[in-house]
């Protein structure tokens, strides 16, 4: 669960663009005319200093709009950003779907992350239309109380000893249900299976067992993110003043609002039932029951103040499901493509979990698995530029780089592939971070859940993903089961493919692996 995860889960924005092309054609003439006139008017009426940085993908003098430049960025962003920062250690501007974006080299990340004038919440609220109905999750994320961030950073950490074992037990059954027990080699759509696994596992800890086994809720949890990304993308193509009207005319807008309505209908009775139970217990002078899920943690953190419970849960699903899935799939694929890792990893899992059981301490001790995942994240970061934020006022960096108020800013992930920082950066070295953990000065930052300027896969504190601690535990838990229970190998003559769109770099949704059931399972302390 990450602020950046909220912005581009998997191939969602590629789906958004494709849907715009297929269903938004009747808008095209009006988009071109109205956007062009509005941009010209805003340019003529604007005042104040403008950025003097070059634009990598400028529109030509005869183009009324930046539509072509936006399409080009969506198609080429990762290669463009890599190309620029492999030769330049200085900022560059791009035309992106929401306007102009200044992308900084990672050498400026330390100064960037400390600037309060650059706001991630402003980005989430603006680019994901938090003021419009249907985007209720983003409205709750960006409220001044920041309740979601507090729950993720505090409750998911302190409650870990209580939820790790129940979550592991739930994941065990889900994995058997999804991946089966066939002991014959067969090809599976591992991308889709892992997405289903994460959806069901995350939902269990978010809303408890009752809704976690409700097929209608699971469908909303999985698909609401796609609908929201599609609609957000389509609205960003329109002038700001027209978006509230367009939102009511677009089919995806209607679908989005219907999903939110149904989510409320499913969740609200559970919330009301728990509150009534709590009040009744307190009236009798007895301690009310406590549930190990985020419904309970939101209630505890809110302390009786109003919050949008459904919006909070939809936002948690949006971030937790798709961000976690990408690293789970990427980590599994990298391990399978390096089969010499399978037995060392199984030995580690047998020893650590076999002796300590499912506890936060045991998950911490899975050091090789942790190193494999952090290396997967380094080799293929989920985004080529991260920590996107809007400037709340004019900002000038110490090197003179000027960012005008209202402009989008991000940091390139170029340092994660810099040979001066990482020897043989293109090579997947699963032991890289395990070796670093042997150095006391580097042991902390070498862990998957911790961040520094050399590895911004989860961002960089204080702009780091607040849910990374939970995500790392969950992913290691699921991978432990998958590696112990099943044999894996790559599909012959099927190279690994990535899907690149806008800022995102994802494992391709068509990714497949071969698998079969092994006779072994995880043996916990005290089991036969």
Curated annotation (Swiss-Prot):
Its cofactor is heme. The chain crosses the membrane at residues 24-44. Its main location: membrane. Binds 1 heme group per subunit. One of its GO terms (biological process) is lovastatin biosynthetic process. Keywords: Endoplasmic reticulum, Heme, Iron, Membrane, Metal-binding, Monooxygenase, Oxidoreductase, Signal-anchor, Transmembrane, Transmembrane helix. Pathway: Polyketide biosynthesis; lovastatin biosynthesis. Belongs to the cytochrome P450 family. This is Dihydromonacolin L monooxygenase LovA. The lineage of its organism: Eukaryota, Fungi, Dikarya, Ascomycota, Pezizomycotina. The gene is lovA.
């Amino acid at each position: 669960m990450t602020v950046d995860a909220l912005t581009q889960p998997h191939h969602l924005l590629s789906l958004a663009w494709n849907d715009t092309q297929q269903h938004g054609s009747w808008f095209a003439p009006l988009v071109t005319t109205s956007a062009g006139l509005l941009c010209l008017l805003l340019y003529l009426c604007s005042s104040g200093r403008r950025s003097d940085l070059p634009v990598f993908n400028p529109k030509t003098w005869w183009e009324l709009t930046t539509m072509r430049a936006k399409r080009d960025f969506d198609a080429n962003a990762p290669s463009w950003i890599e190309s620029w920062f492999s030769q330049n250690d200085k900022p560059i501007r791009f035309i992106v779907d929401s306007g102009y974006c200044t992308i900084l080299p990672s050498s400026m990340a330390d100064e960037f992350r400390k600037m309060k004038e650059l706001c991630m919440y402003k980005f989430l609220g603006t680019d994901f239309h938090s003021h419009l109905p249907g985007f209720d999750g983003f409205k709750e994320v960006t409220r001044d109380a920041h309740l979601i961030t507090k729950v993720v950073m505090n409750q998911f950490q302190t409650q870990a000893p209580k939820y790790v074992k129940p979550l592991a037990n739930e994941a065990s059954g889900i994995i058997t249900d999804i991946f089966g027990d066939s002991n014959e080699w067969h090809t599976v759509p591992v991308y889709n299976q892992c997405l289903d696994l994460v959806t069901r596992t995350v939902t269990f800890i978010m809303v408890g067992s009752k809704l976690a086994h409700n097929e209608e809720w699971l469908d909303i949890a999985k698909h609401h993110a796609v609908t929201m990304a599609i609609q957000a993308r389509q609205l960003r193509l329109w002038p700001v003043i027209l978006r509230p009207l367009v939102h009511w005319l677009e089919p995806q807008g209607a679908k989005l609002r219907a999903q939110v309505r149904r989510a409320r209908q499913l969740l609200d009775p559970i919330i009301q039932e728990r509150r009534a139970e709590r009040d009744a217990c307190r009236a009798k002078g007895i301690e009310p029951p406590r549930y190990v899920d985020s419904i309970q943690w939101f209630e505890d953190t809110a302390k009786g103040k109003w919050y949008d419970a459904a919006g909070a849960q939809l936002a948690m699903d949006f971030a937790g499901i798709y961000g976690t899935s990408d690293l789970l799939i990427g980590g599994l694929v990298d391990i399978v493509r390096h089969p010499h890792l399978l037995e060392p990893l199984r030995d580690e899992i047998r020893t650590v979990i076999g002796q300590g059981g499912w506890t936060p301490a045991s998950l911490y001790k899975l050091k090789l698995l942790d190193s494999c995942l952090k290396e997967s994240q380094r080799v293929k970061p989920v985004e080529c530029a991260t920590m996107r934020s809007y400037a709340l006022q004019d900002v000038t960096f110490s090197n003179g780089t000027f960012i005008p108020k209202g402009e989008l800013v991000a940091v390139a992930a170029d340092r994660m592939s810099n040979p001066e920082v990482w020897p043989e950066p293109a090579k997947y070295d699963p032991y890289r971070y395990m070796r670093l953990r042997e150095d006391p000065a580097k042991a902390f930052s070498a862990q998957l859940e911790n961040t520094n300027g050399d590895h911004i896969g989860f961002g960089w504190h204080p702009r780091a993903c607040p849910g990374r601690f939970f995500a790392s535990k969950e992913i290691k838990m699921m991978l432990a089961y998958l590696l112990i229970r099943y044999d894996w190998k790559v599909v012959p003559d099927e190279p690994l493919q990535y899907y690149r769109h806008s800022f995102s770099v994802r494992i391709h949704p068509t990714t497949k692996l071969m698998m079969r059931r092994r006779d072994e399972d995880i043996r916990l302390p005290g089991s036969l």
